[in-house]
C-alpha cells in the first residue's frame, strides 16, 4: 500500500464518519464538561494506585454524562485514530523492530473503523401477563487491560473503543517493548475523548512498565475487569492473582490451514501467502502451517512457486533456520521458546541469518516438510511457513486438529466441497474459522467486526463493547403490559 493510497483511504473514511455521524442536537446543546477540552492531562500516572484512582473518578463522571455524549466520545476517538494510523504504524515498527508498517496501517485502520461502539449495547424488554422486565447494559467501572508488543497501537485503539463504549474507564499496562507507541496512542485517544466532552483520566497508564506493576494492576481491588492480550505467562498471572473479578484472557494459537483438491488454484496459495506474510506473521490468527491433501499437493506447490512473494527453502536451509529461530519447540511442547531476535522480522532478515539473499519482493519463506516437523507444531510468529501433505481430507483435518493444540483459536480451509468445510469447522470448534480466504478476513477485513483481543481460553471469543458491560434486570410487575 503506497503513501498516496493510505492518504486517500484515511480521507475517505474521515469524510464518511463526518457524514454518517453528525453531532446530535442533544449533545450540541449540552453544557461543556468541566474538564478543559484542550488536554487530557496526559495518560501517564506515577503509580498503579494513582492510575486506578484517576480512572475511578473519571468513570463515575463519564457514566453520568449519558449515552449521547458517549457516542460522540467514541466518534472522536475513531477520528483521532484514523488520522494517525500511519504515524502509529511507523512508531510501532521503529520501537519494537517487528512487523511491516504498511500492514500495521491496515490493522490500525480496521480497528478504528470496525470495532463496535455504543450500538453493541442492545437493551431488551420482556413483557407478559405479569408485567415487564427491562434489561440494560451497565459498565463495570475500571478495566485493567494488558497489551502486547506485537500489535501495540491496534490493540490500544480496539480495546479503548470497546471499553469506553461500554461506559468504563481503562488502565492500560503496555508491554515494555512497545510502551512509547502505546502511550502515544493513548494520548491521542484521551485528548479526542476530552475534546468531545469526556472527563480526563478515562484512558490512563502508569510509569515503569514491569512484571510487578502488571501484577499489582491485575490484583488491584478497584479494577472490575481484567483484560489480557498476551502470551501464556501473563495469562497465567491474570488467572491466578487471587481476586474475584471478570477476566478475559487471550491465549496462544497455532492456526492450521487445510487445502483440499477442490480448492480454487492458484487463489488458495495467493491467500495463504498474503495471510502468512501479513505484518510478518505476528498476528495470533495468521496462517502458521498448511496441510494439503495428496491429491492437491502438486497444484498447490506449483502455485506457491509461481508467486514472487514466496521463496522456497531447501531441506538444509530449513534445518539451519529452524535451529536459529526456535530454541524450544516441536510436537508435544506446551511452552515453545522462540529466538526473539527473529520474531516479526522480514523474510529477508530471516534469510540473512543463514547467509541467504532473497529477492526484494519475497515476503515469505516456505518449505515442504514431513508431518512431524517442529515447524508444524510450533507457533513461530514469523514469515516462515511449513507445508505438509496428508493422505486425504480426513487425515488433513485430523492433523490440523492436533497441530492446533486444542487452543480452539483460529483455523482455515480452502475447499469448494461444502461437506469438507462443514466437517473441519465442526471438528476444530475455533473462535475463528475462515473458508477460502486469508484468516485476516475473520478479524474485521471481511464481514463482521474487528478485535485485537480474542478471549478463547475464557470463552469470550472476539471481544467487543458488550463484553465490558454487565446486564441489569429491572422488573415491574402488574403494569406496562399494553397488548
Where are these regions (language model features)?
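N-terminal Rossmann-like NAD(P)+-binding subdomain of aldehyde/semialdehyde dehydrogenases
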Residues: 3-134, 162, 306
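Structural signal for hydrophobic packing residues in well-ordered secondary-structure cores
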Residues: 14-21, 56-59, 63, 77-85, ...
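ALDH superfamily catalytic-core signature
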Residues: 157, 235-364, 370-371
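Rossmann-like NAD(P) dinucleotide-binding subdomain of oxidoreductase/dehydrogenase enzymes
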Residues: 123-267
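Flexible, glycine/charged-enriched surface loops at secondary-structure junctions
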Residues: 64-69, 197-202, 280-284, 310-322, ...
Amino acid at each position: 500500500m503506497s503513501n498516496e493510497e493510505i492518504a486517500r483511504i484515511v480521507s475517505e473514511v474521515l469524510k464518511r464518519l463526518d457524514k454518517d455521524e453528525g453531532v446530535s442536537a442533544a449533545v450540541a446543546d449540552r453544557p461543556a464538561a468541566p474538564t478543559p477540552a484542550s488536554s487530557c492531562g496526559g495518560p501517564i500516572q506515577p503509580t498503579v494506585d494513582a492510575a486506578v484512582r484517576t480512572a475511578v473518578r473519571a468513570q463515575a463522571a463519564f457514566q453520568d454524562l449519558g449515552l449521547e455524549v458517549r457516542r460522540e466520545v467514541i466518534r472522536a476517538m475513531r477520528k483521532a485514530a484514523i488520522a494517525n494510523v500511519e504515524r502509529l504504524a511507523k512508531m510501532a515498527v521503529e520501537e519494537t523492530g517487528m512487523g511491516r508498517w504498511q500492514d500495521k496501517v491496515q490493522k490500525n485502520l480496521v480497528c478504528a473503523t470496525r470495532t463496535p461502539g455504543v450500538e453493541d449495547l442492545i437493551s431488551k424488554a420482556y413483557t407478559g401477563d405479569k408485567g415487564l422486565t427491562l434489561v440494560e447494559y451497565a459498565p463495570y467501572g475500571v478495566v485493567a487491560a494488558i497489551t502486547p508488543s506485537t500489535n501495540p497501537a491496534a490493540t490500544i485503539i480496539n480495546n479503548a473503543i470497546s471499553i469506553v463504549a461500554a461506559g468504563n474507564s481503562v488502565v492500560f499496562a503496555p508491554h515494555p517493548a512497545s510502551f512509547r507507541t502505546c502511550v502515544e496512542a493513548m494520548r491521542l485517544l484521551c485528548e479526542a475523548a476530552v475534546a468531545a466532552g469526556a472527563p480526563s483520566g478515562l484512558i490512563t497508564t502508569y510509569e515503569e512498565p514491569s512484571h510487578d506493576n502488571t501484577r499489582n494492576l491485575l490484583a488491584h481491588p478497584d479494577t472490575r475487569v481484567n483484560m489480557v492480550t498476551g502470551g501464556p505467562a501473563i495469562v497465567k498471572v491474570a488467572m491466578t492473582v487471587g481476586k474475584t473479578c471478570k477476566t478475559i484472557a487471550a491465549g496462544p494459537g497455532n492456526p492450521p490451514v487445510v487445502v483440499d483438491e477442490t480448492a480454487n488454484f492458484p487463489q488458495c496459495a495467493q491467500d495463504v501467502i498474503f495471510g502468512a506474510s501479513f505484518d510478518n506473521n505476528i498476528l495470533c490468527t495468521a496462517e502458521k502451517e498448511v496441510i494439503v491433501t495428496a491429491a492437491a499437493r502438486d497444484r498447490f506447490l506449483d502455485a506457491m512457486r509461481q508467486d514472487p512473494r514466496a521463496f522456497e527453502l531447501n531441506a538444509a536451509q530449513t534445518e539451519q533456520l529452524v535451529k536459529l529461530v526456535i530454541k524450544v519447540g516441536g510436537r508435544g511442547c506446551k511452552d515453545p521458546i522462540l529466538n526473539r531476535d527473529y520474531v516479526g522480522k522480514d523474510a529477508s532478515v530471516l534469510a540473512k541469518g543463514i547467509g541467504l539473499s532473497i529477492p526484494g519482493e519475497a515476503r515469505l519463506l516456505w518449505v515442504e516438510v514431513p508431518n512431524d516437523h517442529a515447524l508444524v507444531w510450533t507457533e513461530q510468529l514469523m514469515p516462515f511457513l511449513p507445508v505438509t501433505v496428508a493422505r486425504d481430507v480426513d487425515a488433513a483435518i485430523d492433523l490440523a486438529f492436533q497441530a492446533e493444540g486444542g487452543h480452539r483459536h483460529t483455523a482455515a480451509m480452502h475447499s469448494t466441497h461444502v461437506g469438507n468445510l462443514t466437517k473441519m469447522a465442526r471438528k476444530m470448534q475455533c473462535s475463528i474459522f475462515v473458508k477460502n480466504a486469508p484468516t485476516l478476513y475473520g478479524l474485521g477485513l471481511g464481514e463482521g467486526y474487528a478485535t485485537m483481543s480474542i478471549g478463547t481460553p475464557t470463552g469470550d471469543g472476539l471481544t467487543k463493547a458488550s463484553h465490558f458491560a454487565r446486564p441489569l434486570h429491572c422488573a415491574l410487575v402488574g403494569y406496562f403490559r399494553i397488548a
